[in-house]
Amino acid sequence: MKKQHNYTVMHWGTWQVESREGEIVAVKPVPWDKSPSRIGQSLPDAVTSQTRIRRPAVRAGYLQHGPASREGRGKEPFVEVSWEVALDLLARELRSVKARCGNEAIYGGSYGWASAGRFHHAQSQLHRFLKGFGGYTASTNTYSSAAGERILPHILGPLSPLHRQHTHFSELARECQLFVAIGGLPLRNAQVNGGGANDHMLQYWLDKMQANGTRFINISPVRNDLSAVPDAEWLAIRPGTDTALLLALSYVLIAESLYDQAFVASHTVGFAPYRAYLLGEHDGVAKTPAWAAAITGLDAQRIADLAREMARHRTMVNISWSIQRARQGEQAYWATVALTALLGQLGTPGGGLGFGYACTNLAGAVRKAFSGPRLPAGENAVDSVIPVARLSDMLLHPGETYEFDGQQRRYPDIRLVYWAGGNAFHHHQDLNRLCEAWRRPETVVVHEQYWTAQAKFSDIVLPATTSLEREDIGSGGHDGFMIAMSAQIPPVGEARDDYAIFCDLADRLGFGEAFSEGRDAGQWLRHLYEESRPRAQEEGIALPSFDDFWQQGVLEYSAPERPQIFLADFRADPERYPLSTPSGKIELFSATVAGFGYRECPGHPWWDEQEAARQRQEAARWPLHLLSSQPRARLHSQYDHGSVSRATKVQGREPLWMHPSDAQARDIREGSVVKVYNDRGAILAGVHLSEQILPGVVQMSTGAWYDPLDPKEERSLDKHGNPNVLTEDRGSSRLGQGCSAQSCWVEIAPWREELPPITAFDPPRFIEV
């Protein structure tokens, strides 16, 4: 198709691109974006950098000895080969694994954000391909919010649709008097949205709310988690103790008869056992503000006063995704649901509940929505599915059973891992354990654009194009925009689109026609767009023809006439508009969850003193609580090699924020490099000192590319600063089996040796055979 414009879409924004002679010269945010992300400025220098994968490559030992050489994974040089050699080798291994072990032995979960374009979305292409090949072991849920994703259907409803149904910011600006932000409202998180962020609106709406008199309270160990509201009250809570605070707030509402008795009676079930627990009738411990103060570090009187303020004002309570990425993270979400049910403001304009305002650019900003262009994936003939955060457990313990959300399941025996569009060496916890697990399969294949750690730890590496080198359609589906994405530069080196790679593989494996349906990439774009037009029409959106869309470049849908209010219909008539829970109501006590028999997840929200004691023991050994947050200069690990992310480094290392008192006790100074360590590993980091963080707590961003000092050495020092070297690879609970990265304790010491050079962004060594 003829290029008509210069738009491209990334998860963090829509950009106008200037290119010259095969290079990206400049990118400019589109004029309608209120607060553009700066991440896009990494594109010009990153796309054609030395980090780019330019030819297919095979690990030397694998090329010579096949799967028998798996111990060399991540340690050996690579051999660049032709596409014919690489695809023939991969097709042979796929056939072999299928014939010997069945399709269950292929893991294609391939978690990651990939690209914003809807057709060239790498996971969608991979899953369609593997389903056509007979199926694969898949993954379920996310690293971001798995604990919430599993508890909420039992007590309120599925998280994903709830996220899209949040009360619109315009209603909050009109009606909300008090906004309680548990975990803050970080602007850095709201830079992104799956499928593209076209208009960054968080700061705009928070300014509107402040101007209209909304008062904000930031409940977080980190003050700048609500930096968008400088006057917000900061309640510096100890990490991991939010559940205790929420229980105490509910206690005050009940003890002082401040809760909405009529709403509780008509819209909830299970009040009596929950009330009994809060009042201490079960365990002899009333969940009073004084009880919570000893756990959280907050003032008991302030806790009691906060409960009263919430009852007196139109209050929105928002809990961030970060809170549930912890041991028993399900409990904080359940306790938040219970608290807001007691307040009785669910479904009111400006009041109620949020599970992710500021977690992406979506919550509270949904405009006219429809299911946009999407590649049909087909049916998976294999029913093997694991919780995504149990990746290492699956690879290390094939055949073992585990418990998950009321079921007993079995880990499959994975022989081949196929990844496209993600980076397990960013997402996963305890990277030294992952290194061990990653060497268990016979073959690891990756489609990648850059020489990330995951690419360096693979056997067959296939170079893929970036969004700037292919045509696509950008559509988040809910933000009111659709963008025609033109190819801005030719493919770098020998890079191919994922679709072209899979077409060639499918031809070799005998299902090429079924996979491609006889269409090239341009024909697929036209087909998927035209197929989406009737769905848009059902939502009152009239899409032009594909040719007109491509000529125009940008489509913008109108905003809804009536702003969305979360659970308004349920509030008005719970019988006519029941929830999807077993009772159709909010479940303060869940017979379903109680029936699972999990000690750590009884039938109502609770504080697990046994787990708290275990964590105190860890803190006695490792006195600093490490929080790993989303980065502001990249999306997860995407474009860590770009100029924007690299400019944030301290002596080349990922920054670590700590309180001056903690630094002084360890003879650590601003801008110095330190060793951060625990019994799982050690990393280097560069220090920033700040009084905006609670003493005893340190914070790093995730996504620094893993860079072991000596890849041949087990548990080697990561010289770049990836906090997931230090985090524990343990499920949040048997119910959620989510990531528990925020439950992490470390010690820090000055680094007094010579600084090793950063090699994270260097290609591996290549040899000829």
Annotate each PLM feature:
Residues 210-218, 222-312:
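Long, well-ordered, tryptophan-enriched scaffold segments
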Residues 1-258, 708-769:
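N-terminal export/assembly segments and adjacent metallocofactor-ligating motifs
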Residues 122-207, 212-219, 243-244, 340-456, ...:
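Extended redox/cofactor-interaction regions of prokaryotic respiratory oxidoreductases
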Residues 62-85, 251, 258-300, 380, ...:
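N-terminal leader/propeptide and maturation segments of large enzyme subunits in energy/redox metabolism
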Residues 498-552, 637, 641-657, 661-769:
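Long, contiguous, secondary-structure-rich segments that constitute the structural scaffold
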Residues 249, 270-397:
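Active-site phosphate/pyrophosphate-binding segments
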Residues 3-4, 9, 442-443, 449-450, ...:
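Phosphate/diphosphate-binding loops
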Residues 230-237, 465-468, 480-492, 643:
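Short beta-alpha connecting loops at secondary-structure transitions
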